[in-house]
C-alpha cells in the first residue's frame, strides 16, 4: 500500500507540475496576445496620425491655393498696373 501511496503521490505531483507548466504556457500565450494587441494599437495610432497629417496637408494645400487665387485677383484687379510700368519708362 505504501508503494501505491507513493505512486499516487508521484502522479499527483506530476499532475501538479503539468498544471504549473501549463500556467506559464498560458502566460506566454497571453503575453503574445498582449504584444499583438499592442502592435495593433500602435498601428491604429500611426494610421490615425497619418490621416491627421494628410488632412492637415490637404488643408494647407487649400490655404495655399486660396492665397494664390487672392494674388491673381489682386493683380487682375489693378487695371492701371500696366500704365504704372509705362509711366516709369
Swiss-Prot record:
Residues 9-25 have a biased composition (Low complexity). It comes from the Eukaryota. GO terms for cellular component: cytoplasm. It is found in: Cytoplasm. The modification Phosphoserine is found at residues 33, 56. Keywords: Acetylation, Calmodulin-binding, Cytoplasm, Phosphoprotein. Residues 40-53 have a biased composition (Basic and acidic residues). Residues 1-89 are annotated as: Disordered. One of its GO terms (molecular function) is calmodulin binding. Phosphorylation at Ser-56 favors interaction with CALM1. The modification N-acetylserine is found at residue 2. Disulfide bonds: none annotated. May act as a competitive inhibitor of calmodulin-dependent enzymes such as calcineurin in neurons. Interacts with CALM1. This is cAMP-regulated phosphoprotein 21. It comes from Pongo abelii (Sumatran orangutan). The lineage of its organism: Eukaryota, Metazoa, Chordata, Craniata, Vertebrata. The gene is ARPP21.
